[in-house]
Amino acid sequence: METAIESIQAREILDSRGRPTVEAEVHLVNGSMGLAQVPSGASTGSFEAHELRDGDKGRYSGKGVLTAVKNVEEQITPNLVKINALNQNLVDSKMIEIDGSPNKSNLGANAILAVSLATAKAAANSVGMPLYRYLGGPQASLLPVPLMNVINGGAHAANNVDIQEFMIVPVGATSFKEALRWGAEVFATLSGVLKDKGLLGGVGDEGGYAPNLGSNQEALDILIAAIEKAGYKPGEQVALALDVAASEFYKDGNYIYDGATHSPSELIDYLASLVDQYPIVSIEDGLHEEDWESWVQLTQKLGSKVQLVGDDLFVTNGSRLQKGIDMAAGNSILIKLNQIGSLSETLETIDLATRNSYRSVISHRSGETEDTTIADLAVGTRAGQIKTGSLCRSERVAKYNRLLRIEDELGDRAVYAGVIGLGPKSRS
Protein backbone atom coordinates (compact mmCIF):
# COMPACT_ATOMS: atom_id res chain seq x y z
CA MET A 1 0.00 0.00 0.00
CA GLU A 2 1.54 3.27 -1.16
CA THR A 3 0.17 5.30 1.78
CA ALA A 4 1.25 2.79 4.43
CA ILE A 5 3.65 3.92 7.15
CA GLU A 6 7.15 2.68 6.34
CA SER A 7 9.21 4.20 9.15
CA ILE A 8 9.06 6.65 12.05
CA GLN A 9 11.90 8.65 13.56
CA ALA A 10 11.84 10.74 16.72
CA ARG A 11 14.32 13.10 18.30
CA GLU A 12 14.73 15.46 21.23
CA ILE A 13 14.68 19.13 20.14
CA LEU A 14 14.23 22.43 21.98
CA ASP A 15 11.12 24.55 22.38
CA SER A 16 10.93 28.34 22.63
CA ARG A 17 11.89 28.29 26.30
CA GLY A 18 15.00 26.20 25.65
CA ARG A 19 13.37 23.10 27.11
CA PRO A 20 13.39 19.72 25.38
CA THR A 21 10.40 18.52 23.40
CA VAL A 22 9.65 15.74 20.92
CA GLU A 23 9.88 15.92 17.13
CA ALA A 24 8.72 13.05 14.93
CA GLU A 25 9.06 12.16 11.26
CA VAL A 26 6.65 9.73 9.63
CA HIS A 27 7.72 8.28 6.27
CA LEU A 28 5.29 6.51 3.93
CA VAL A 29 5.96 3.82 1.34
CA ASN A 30 5.36 6.30 -1.50
CA GLY A 31 8.09 8.61 -0.19
CA SER A 32 5.79 11.15 1.46
CA MET A 33 6.96 12.49 4.81
CA GLY A 34 5.39 14.40 7.68
CA LEU A 35 7.31 16.31 10.37
CA ALA A 36 5.74 17.48 13.64
CA GLN A 37 6.91 19.04 16.89
CA VAL A 38 4.93 19.22 20.12
CA PRO A 39 4.61 22.25 22.44
CA SER A 40 4.37 22.41 26.23
CA GLY A 41 2.56 24.68 28.68
CA ALA A 42 3.56 26.69 31.76
CA SER A 43 0.06 27.15 33.17
CA THR A 44 -1.25 23.59 32.86
CA GLY A 45 -4.61 22.14 33.84
CA SER A 46 -4.58 19.28 36.35
CA PHE A 47 -6.51 17.06 33.94
CA GLU A 48 -4.25 17.37 30.91
CA ALA A 49 -2.73 14.33 29.22
CA HIS A 50 0.65 13.43 30.71
CA GLU A 51 3.77 15.01 29.23
CA LEU A 52 6.52 12.44 29.79
CA ARG A 53 9.82 13.86 31.09
CA ASP A 54 12.93 11.83 31.94
CA GLY A 55 13.44 13.08 35.48
CA ASP A 56 17.22 12.79 35.11
CA LYS A 57 18.48 15.84 37.00
CA GLY A 58 21.82 15.54 35.22
CA ARG A 59 20.20 16.47 31.87
CA TYR A 60 18.09 19.58 31.29
CA SER A 61 17.23 19.68 35.03
CA GLY A 62 15.18 16.52 34.62
CA LYS A 63 13.11 17.85 31.72
CA GLY A 64 14.66 15.71 28.97
CA VAL A 65 12.37 13.67 26.71
CA LEU A 66 14.64 10.79 25.68
CA THR A 67 12.22 8.30 27.25
CA ALA A 68 9.39 9.62 25.07
CA VAL A 69 11.68 9.45 22.01
CA LYS A 70 12.60 5.86 22.91
CA ASN A 71 8.90 5.01 23.26
CA VAL A 72 8.29 6.24 19.72
CA GLU A 73 11.11 4.14 18.33
CA GLU A 74 10.64 0.96 20.37
CA GLN A 75 6.91 0.77 21.13
CA ILE A 76 4.99 2.95 18.69
CA THR A 77 6.90 2.33 15.45
CA PRO A 78 6.66 -1.51 15.40
CA ASN A 79 2.90 -1.27 15.89
CA LEU A 80 2.26 1.39 13.23
CA VAL A 81 4.45 0.19 10.36
CA LYS A 82 2.26 -0.99 7.43
CA ILE A 83 -0.83 0.85 8.76
CA ASN A 84 -2.49 3.20 6.25
CA ALA A 85 -1.60 6.78 7.18
CA LEU A 86 -4.90 7.92 5.66
CA ASN A 87 -6.68 6.16 8.54
CA GLN A 88 -5.92 8.70 11.26
CA ASN A 89 -8.40 7.21 13.72
CA LEU A 90 -6.75 3.79 13.48
CA VAL A 91 -3.27 5.25 13.92
CA ASP A 92 -4.30 7.22 17.01
CA SER A 93 -6.42 4.48 18.58
CA LYS A 94 -3.55 2.02 18.13
CA MET A 95 -1.19 4.30 20.07
CA ILE A 96 -3.79 4.91 22.78
CA GLU A 97 -4.29 1.15 23.07
CA ILE A 98 -0.55 0.50 23.39
CA ASP A 99 -0.31 3.18 26.07
CA GLY A 100 -3.16 1.68 28.06
CA SER A 101 -3.40 4.49 30.64
CA PRO A 102 -6.23 7.00 31.10
CA ASN A 103 -3.93 10.00 30.51
CA LYS A 104 -1.23 8.69 28.14
CA SER A 105 1.29 8.51 30.97
CA ASN A 106 2.99 5.30 29.80
CA LEU A 107 4.11 6.35 26.32
CA GLY A 108 3.71 10.08 26.98
CA ALA A 109 1.23 12.42 25.32
CA ASN A 110 4.23 14.19 23.80
CA ALA A 111 5.33 10.97 22.07
CA ILE A 112 1.82 10.08 20.86
CA LEU A 113 0.96 13.58 19.63
CA ALA A 114 4.21 13.99 17.70
CA VAL A 115 3.50 10.80 15.75
CA SER A 116 -0.21 11.61 15.39
CA LEU A 117 0.46 15.01 13.79
CA ALA A 118 3.36 13.79 11.67
CA THR A 119 1.12 11.02 10.32
CA ALA A 120 -1.57 13.52 9.30
CA LYS A 121 1.02 15.69 7.56
CA ALA A 122 2.49 12.70 5.72
CA ALA A 123 -1.00 11.65 4.66
CA ALA A 124 -1.83 15.16 3.42
CA ASN A 125 1.43 15.28 1.46
CA SER A 126 0.72 11.86 -0.04
CA VAL A 127 -2.55 13.07 -1.58
CA GLY A 128 -1.11 16.43 -2.62
CA MET A 129 -3.17 18.57 -0.26
CA PRO A 130 -2.24 21.25 2.27
CA LEU A 131 -3.04 20.09 5.79
CA TYR A 132 -6.03 22.43 6.24
CA ARG A 133 -7.66 21.06 3.10
CA TYR A 134 -6.90 17.45 4.09
CA LEU A 135 -8.54 18.02 7.48
CA GLY A 136 -11.46 20.17 6.41
CA GLY A 137 -12.27 19.37 2.81
CA PRO A 138 -13.40 21.93 0.23
CA GLN A 139 -15.33 24.03 2.79
CA ALA A 140 -12.15 24.87 4.73
CA SER A 141 -11.94 28.55 3.83
CA LEU A 142 -12.63 30.47 7.07
CA LEU A 143 -9.62 32.42 8.35
CA PRO A 144 -9.67 32.81 12.15
CA VAL A 145 -9.79 36.07 14.08
CA PRO A 146 -6.58 36.19 16.15
CA LEU A 147 -6.65 36.81 19.90
CA MET A 148 -3.24 38.45 20.28
CA ASN A 149 -1.59 38.32 23.70
CA VAL A 150 0.23 41.64 23.99
CA ILE A 151 0.47 42.15 27.76
CA ASN A 152 1.55 39.14 29.81
CA GLY A 153 1.00 38.59 33.52
CA GLY A 154 0.45 35.67 35.86
CA ALA A 155 2.44 32.49 35.19
CA HIS A 156 3.67 33.82 31.83
CA ALA A 157 5.67 36.73 33.23
CA ALA A 158 7.70 37.76 36.25
CA ASN A 159 5.56 40.77 37.21
CA ASN A 160 2.82 41.78 39.63
CA VAL A 161 -0.19 41.50 37.29
CA ASP A 162 -2.71 38.79 38.28
CA ILE A 163 -4.45 38.23 34.95
CA GLN A 164 -2.29 36.05 32.72
CA GLU A 165 -3.09 37.46 29.28
CA PHE A 166 -4.44 40.75 27.97
CA MET A 167 -5.30 40.33 24.29
CA ILE A 168 -6.26 42.54 21.38
CA VAL A 169 -8.80 41.16 18.91
CA PRO A 170 -9.08 42.82 15.47
CA VAL A 171 -12.76 42.02 14.99
CA GLY A 172 -13.46 44.79 12.49
CA ALA A 173 -10.92 43.80 9.84
CA THR A 174 -12.09 42.52 6.47
CA SER A 175 -9.28 39.99 5.90
CA PHE A 176 -6.72 38.10 7.94
CA LYS A 177 -3.97 40.14 6.31
CA GLU A 178 -5.63 43.34 7.48
CA ALA A 179 -6.26 41.91 10.96
CA LEU A 180 -2.60 41.00 11.31
CA ARG A 181 -1.53 44.50 10.23
CA TRP A 182 -3.90 46.12 12.73
CA GLY A 183 -2.56 43.90 15.50
CA ALA A 184 1.05 44.60 14.58
CA GLU A 185 0.43 48.35 14.50
CA VAL A 186 -1.28 48.34 17.89
CA PHE A 187 1.55 46.21 19.31
CA ALA A 188 4.16 48.62 17.97
CA THR A 189 2.22 51.57 19.37
CA LEU A 190 1.91 49.80 22.72
CA SER A 191 5.70 49.78 22.93
CA GLY A 192 5.72 53.58 22.72
CA VAL A 193 2.90 53.97 25.25
CA LEU A 194 4.75 51.80 27.76
CA LYS A 195 8.03 53.59 27.07
CA ASP A 196 6.43 56.98 27.72
CA LYS A 197 5.25 55.70 31.09
CA GLY A 198 8.67 54.28 31.94
CA LEU A 199 7.22 50.77 31.86
CA LEU A 200 8.86 49.23 28.81
CA GLY A 201 10.76 46.09 29.75
CA GLY A 202 11.18 42.59 28.40
CA VAL A 203 8.58 40.29 26.90
CA GLY A 204 6.95 37.19 28.38
CA ASP A 205 6.90 33.62 27.07
CA GLU A 206 4.34 34.46 24.40
CA GLY A 207 5.95 37.66 23.17
CA GLY A 208 3.78 40.16 25.00
CA TYR A 209 5.16 42.92 27.16
CA ALA A 210 5.38 42.18 30.88
CA PRO A 211 5.35 45.55 32.67
CA ASN A 212 4.90 45.99 36.40
CA LEU A 213 1.55 47.73 36.63
CA GLY A 214 -0.50 48.97 39.54
CA SER A 215 -3.58 46.94 38.67
CA ASN A 216 -5.25 44.77 36.06
CA GLN A 217 -7.34 47.79 35.04
CA GLU A 218 -4.17 49.73 34.28
CA ALA A 219 -3.26 47.09 31.70
CA LEU A 220 -6.67 47.51 30.06
CA ASP A 221 -6.39 51.31 30.10
CA ILE A 222 -2.97 51.11 28.46
CA LEU A 223 -4.36 48.83 25.74
CA ILE A 224 -7.22 51.23 25.03
CA ALA A 225 -4.68 54.06 24.75
CA ALA A 226 -2.53 52.03 22.35
CA ILE A 227 -5.51 51.09 20.17
CA GLU A 228 -6.61 54.72 19.91
CA LYS A 229 -3.10 56.04 19.34
CA ALA A 230 -2.65 53.51 16.51
CA GLY A 231 -5.73 55.03 14.86
CA TYR A 232 -8.34 52.37 15.63
CA LYS A 233 -11.66 52.38 17.48
CA PRO A 234 -11.71 50.24 20.64
CA GLY A 235 -14.48 47.66 20.47
CA GLU A 236 -15.64 48.47 16.96
CA GLN A 237 -12.36 47.69 15.20
CA VAL A 238 -10.10 46.22 17.88
CA ALA A 239 -11.69 44.58 20.92
CA LEU A 240 -10.13 43.13 24.08
CA ALA A 241 -9.95 39.62 25.54
CA LEU A 242 -8.63 38.20 28.82
CA ASP A 243 -7.13 34.94 29.99
CA VAL A 244 -7.66 35.21 33.73
CA ALA A 245 -6.08 31.78 34.46
CA ALA A 246 -7.90 31.88 37.80
CA SER A 247 -6.70 28.41 38.82
CA GLU A 248 -3.27 30.00 39.28
CA PHE A 249 -4.46 32.30 42.09
CA TYR A 250 -7.07 30.01 43.68
CA LYS A 251 -6.55 28.86 47.27
CA ASP A 252 -8.90 27.08 49.67
CA GLY A 253 -12.08 28.05 47.85
CA ASN A 254 -11.14 31.69 47.36
CA TYR A 255 -9.21 33.80 44.85
CA ILE A 256 -6.21 35.94 45.75
CA TYR A 257 -5.81 38.95 43.45
CA ASP A 258 -5.17 42.68 43.80
CA GLY A 259 -3.38 41.83 47.03
CA ALA A 260 -6.49 40.51 48.81
CA THR A 261 -8.60 37.36 49.20
CA HIS A 262 -11.94 37.26 47.37
CA SER A 263 -14.88 34.86 47.19
CA PRO A 264 -15.98 33.29 43.87
CA SER A 265 -18.99 35.63 43.72
CA GLU A 266 -16.71 38.63 44.23
CA LEU A 267 -14.51 37.50 41.34
CA ILE A 268 -17.59 37.05 39.15
CA ASP A 269 -18.75 40.58 40.02
CA TYR A 270 -15.25 41.89 39.34
CA LEU A 271 -15.19 40.31 35.87
CA ALA A 272 -18.68 41.65 35.17
CA SER A 273 -17.50 45.15 36.10
CA LEU A 274 -14.59 44.85 33.66
CA VAL A 275 -16.99 43.79 30.89
CA ASP A 276 -19.15 46.84 31.64
CA GLN A 277 -16.17 49.22 31.56
CA TYR A 278 -14.15 47.86 28.63
CA PRO A 279 -14.86 46.40 25.15
CA ILE A 280 -14.09 42.85 26.28
CA VAL A 281 -15.44 40.11 24.01
CA SER A 282 -13.85 37.00 25.54
CA ILE A 283 -12.83 35.80 29.03
CA GLU A 284 -10.85 32.58 29.40
CA ASP A 285 -10.59 30.57 32.63
CA GLY A 286 -12.40 33.17 34.71
CA LEU A 287 -12.65 30.66 37.57
CA HIS A 288 -10.85 27.59 38.95
CA GLU A 289 -10.93 24.39 36.88
CA GLU A 290 -12.97 22.53 39.53
CA ASP A 291 -15.21 25.41 40.64
CA TRP A 292 -18.07 24.14 38.47
CA GLU A 293 -20.92 25.78 40.36
CA SER A 294 -19.26 29.18 40.15
CA TRP A 295 -18.71 28.60 36.42
CA VAL A 296 -22.47 28.09 36.07
CA GLN A 297 -23.07 31.37 37.93
CA LEU A 298 -20.52 33.19 35.77
CA THR A 299 -22.20 31.85 32.62
CA GLN A 300 -25.64 32.91 33.84
CA LYS A 301 -24.31 36.41 34.52
CA LEU A 302 -22.08 36.99 31.48
CA GLY A 303 -22.72 34.17 28.99
CA SER A 304 -25.10 36.26 26.87
CA LYS A 305 -22.64 39.16 26.75
CA VAL A 306 -19.21 37.65 26.15
CA GLN A 307 -17.45 34.48 25.17
CA LEU A 308 -16.55 32.41 28.26
CA VAL A 309 -13.75 30.03 27.35
CA GLY A 310 -12.79 26.93 29.29
CA ASP A 311 -9.11 26.02 29.07
CA ASP A 312 -8.04 24.44 32.37
CA LEU A 313 -11.75 23.72 32.86
CA PHE A 314 -12.11 21.51 29.77
CA VAL A 315 -8.47 20.66 28.80
CA THR A 316 -9.62 19.70 25.26
CA ASN A 317 -11.23 16.66 26.88
CA GLY A 318 -14.59 15.50 25.50
CA SER A 319 -15.86 14.11 28.80
CA ARG A 320 -15.11 17.33 30.68
CA LEU A 321 -16.64 19.38 27.87
CA GLN A 322 -19.77 17.20 28.03
CA LYS A 323 -20.03 17.93 31.76
CA GLY A 324 -19.79 21.65 30.99
CA ILE A 325 -22.46 21.35 28.31
CA ASP A 326 -24.77 19.45 30.68
CA MET A 327 -24.28 22.05 33.43
CA ALA A 328 -24.28 25.09 31.07
CA ALA A 329 -20.81 26.08 32.27
CA GLY A 330 -19.01 28.36 29.82
CA ASN A 331 -19.92 28.71 26.16
CA SER A 332 -16.58 28.09 24.44
CA ILE A 333 -13.60 25.76 24.65
CA LEU A 334 -9.90 26.38 24.16
CA ILE A 335 -8.36 23.69 21.96
CA LYS A 336 -4.78 22.66 22.71
CA LEU A 337 -3.58 19.57 20.91
CA ASN A 338 -1.22 18.46 23.65
CA GLN A 339 -3.87 18.66 26.38
CA ILE A 340 -5.55 15.55 24.97
CA GLY A 341 -2.58 14.17 23.04
CA SER A 342 -3.86 13.07 19.62
CA LEU A 343 -5.31 14.67 16.51
CA SER A 344 -8.33 12.35 16.36
CA GLU A 345 -9.43 13.13 19.91
CA THR A 346 -8.90 16.84 19.28
CA LEU A 347 -11.18 16.73 16.23
CA GLU A 348 -13.79 14.77 18.20
CA THR A 349 -13.79 17.43 20.94
CA ILE A 350 -14.16 20.24 18.40
CA ASP A 351 -17.06 18.36 16.80
CA LEU A 352 -18.75 17.89 20.19
CA ALA A 353 -18.40 21.62 20.87
CA THR A 354 -19.82 22.57 17.47
CA ARG A 355 -22.81 20.25 17.83
CA ASN A 356 -23.65 21.89 21.15
CA SER A 357 -23.15 25.51 20.01
CA TYR A 358 -19.89 25.94 21.94
CA ARG A 359 -17.25 27.86 20.04
CA SER A 360 -13.70 26.52 19.67
CA VAL A 361 -10.57 28.65 19.99
CA ILE A 362 -7.49 26.92 18.57
CA SER A 363 -4.47 27.63 20.76
CA HIS A 364 -0.71 27.45 21.03
CA ARG A 365 1.17 26.80 24.29
CA SER A 366 3.60 29.08 26.09
CA GLY A 367 6.44 26.70 25.19
CA GLU A 368 6.17 26.57 21.38
CA THR A 369 8.15 25.46 18.33
CA GLU A 370 8.26 26.51 14.69
CA ASP A 371 5.54 23.92 13.93
CA THR A 372 2.50 25.63 12.35
CA THR A 373 -0.06 22.82 12.61
CA ILE A 374 -2.50 24.91 14.65
CA ALA A 375 -2.86 27.43 11.80
CA ASP A 376 -4.01 24.64 9.48
CA LEU A 377 -6.19 23.17 12.24
CA ALA A 378 -7.97 26.51 12.73
CA VAL A 379 -8.81 26.77 9.03
CA GLY A 380 -9.49 23.05 8.57
CA THR A 381 -12.06 22.96 11.37
CA ARG A 382 -13.58 26.38 10.58
CA ALA A 383 -13.02 27.26 14.24
CA GLY A 384 -13.05 31.00 13.55
CA GLN A 385 -10.54 31.90 16.28
CA ILE A 386 -6.88 31.33 17.06
CA LYS A 387 -4.60 32.21 19.97
CA THR A 388 -0.95 32.15 19.03
CA GLY A 389 0.66 34.91 21.02
CA SER A 390 2.02 38.33 20.31
CA LEU A 391 3.44 40.00 17.22
CA CYS A 392 7.04 39.10 18.02
CA ARG A 393 9.03 35.91 18.69
CA SER A 394 9.32 33.80 15.56
CA GLU A 395 7.62 30.73 17.05
CA ARG A 396 4.47 32.89 17.37
CA VAL A 397 4.82 34.80 14.10
CA ALA A 398 5.33 31.51 12.20
CA LYS A 399 1.66 30.66 12.76
CA TYR A 400 0.50 34.10 11.59
CA ASN A 401 2.66 33.83 8.48
CA ARG A 402 1.24 30.38 7.74
CA LEU A 403 -2.27 31.86 7.90
CA LEU A 404 -1.22 34.60 5.47
CA ARG A 405 -0.08 31.93 3.02
CA ILE A 406 -3.31 29.98 3.44
CA GLU A 407 -5.33 33.14 2.79
CA ASP A 408 -3.31 33.74 -0.38
CA GLU A 409 -3.83 30.13 -1.51
CA LEU A 410 -7.58 30.40 -0.99
CA GLY A 411 -7.82 33.65 -2.95
CA ASP A 412 -11.41 34.79 -3.43
CA ARG A 413 -12.69 31.82 -1.42
CA ALA A 414 -11.04 33.09 1.77
CA VAL A 415 -13.43 34.51 4.39
CA TYR A 416 -12.16 36.30 7.50
CA ALA A 417 -14.13 35.32 10.61
CA GLY A 418 -14.00 38.75 12.29
CA VAL A 419 -16.96 39.26 14.59
CA ILE A 420 -18.73 36.09 13.41
CA GLY A 421 -16.00 34.05 15.05
CA LEU A 422 -16.77 35.52 18.46
CA GLY A 423 -19.50 35.73 21.04
CA PRO A 424 -22.74 37.66 21.52
CA LYS A 425 -21.27 41.02 22.56
CA SER A 426 -19.19 41.35 19.40
CA ARG A 427 -22.24 40.72 17.23
CA SER A 428 -24.55 43.15 18.98
From Swiss-Prot:
Mg(2+) binds at residues 243, 284, 311. (2R)-2-phosphoglycerate binds at residues 164, 336, 365-366, 387. It is an enzyme of class 4 (lyase). It is found in: Cytoplasm; Secreted; Cell surface. InterPro entries: Enolase (IPR000941), Enolase-like_C_sf (IPR036849), Enolase-like_N (IPR029017), Enolase_C (IPR020810), Enolase_CS (IPR020809), Enolase_N (IPR020811). Belongs to the enolase family. NCBIfam families: eno. This is Enolase. It comes from Trichodesmium erythraeum (strain IMS101).
